Amino acid sequence: MRMRLVLAFVSLLTTTGLAQTPPQDNQTVKVGPWTVATTYEADKFNHCTMSSSAEDLGISFVRDQDELSLVLDSSKWKLERGKAYSVRLVAGSQSIEAKALAQAKSVTIALTDRPFNGKLRIANALEVRGEGATLHVPLVGSAAALERLEACFDKNERESTETNPFVAPSRKP
């Protein structure tokens, strides 16, 4: 009797602990040279990332509820934290002006132009042209990886949305 009670208690603790942790399946997936990962903060979905590297350049595309962003980092950089550097992004025959927001060793570039983002899916490379240099960002295999990034975001955003089962959902056009 005592053994059954102990086993039941251990089972309850294990089940409760598993129910409180975010889902562990498919949190990191390799898609060609890219790694697509899910990030949680305080047990809530935060964003999905698609990462790779080329020489000393770290490359990450981050998809959160607001936008798609490109994060570039290098241990060789010495940037002015908080500064917004003007850059020109070139993918194939299309280019746009953007701002690269700096940290000490990285920059974040918001990718808000939908037609340009579509071009990223089919381009072999992205050029990030700054005043001092042009960075060559290889995009080999990025079409499939970007699709997986969007699927990661859609799936986790849908699953993390808090709902009230006792009221009708709001209808939005």
Segments from the language model and where they lie:
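Bacterial N-terminal signal peptides
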Residues: 6-15
